[in-house]
Amino acid sequence: EKKDEKIQRRQKPKVEIKKEEPKSDVVLASKRVTLDNKGIGKVKNVELSPTIDNAMVERGAALFKTNCTACHKTNKRFVGPNPTGIMERRSPEWIMNMILDPKLMTEEDQCAKDLLVEFNGASMANQNLTEEQARDILEYFRTLK
């Protein structure tokens, strides 16, 4: 009998494996598609030509590198969202309004508010860019796919 007791004592206790709760259907703000939302701000309408303007892209890429890469990376999630594919998720107006007045957007636009929460309250700094500069960055974003 003692031998049987030893075997029983040496047996590993049964571990109850908890099943993971199914993940909710909530889509992260950075992945959400809101093309009908123009955001809050002075940009009401942006006309995009069917072709990419390479001069604008060059200027936009330079502006992005200088003003945005401390928080945004085009190849990964960082302090702020990755702008790659942004044109498939946000309207041109929303993007420009976010670039031009991130404070107003995070105060009044629900998607921008949700992004602020998703990125742990890291507010986007206002770079005090002109509309023309924001439009150049937008053109650069059109090339990020």
Residue ranges of model-derived segments:
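Axial heme c-ligation environment in periplasmic c-type cytochrome domains
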Residues: 79-86, 104-133
